[in-house]
């Protein structure tokens, strides 16, 4: 089975605490399961055949707060870099930090960096799980 790396990247970008993505190990089909706390878990293709699926990295696995810290050294303007570092240290959320990057005119650079990091994670995930992938 071969998976398209682009499909994994799309799943990573949509990732949130309530959406879990799974890959069918037999045919490469992607399944989406919504997990809302307090909701009864409905039967779905993943729960019906758990051995056929492998869970993609979750939002926690992707660790955007840590990833955004890795972006700071790439910021060219020392003043922006220092201000942004202070915002990180103040404990601002990723969405608040992204708004700051937008105000600084750097949000597209962040999204490009994030996508490159997602690509590395996707490749490693495929390799760790013995899944072939195409770029």
Model-identified regions with their sequence ranges:
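Extended, charge-biased low-complexity segments
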Residues: 1-48
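Short, exposed beta-strand "edge-strand" segments with a Pro/Gly-rich flavor and a Y/T-containing core
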Residues: 1-3, 58, 88-89
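Aromatic-anchored, charged helix-turn/loop surface patch used as a conserved interaction hotspot
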Residues: 29-85
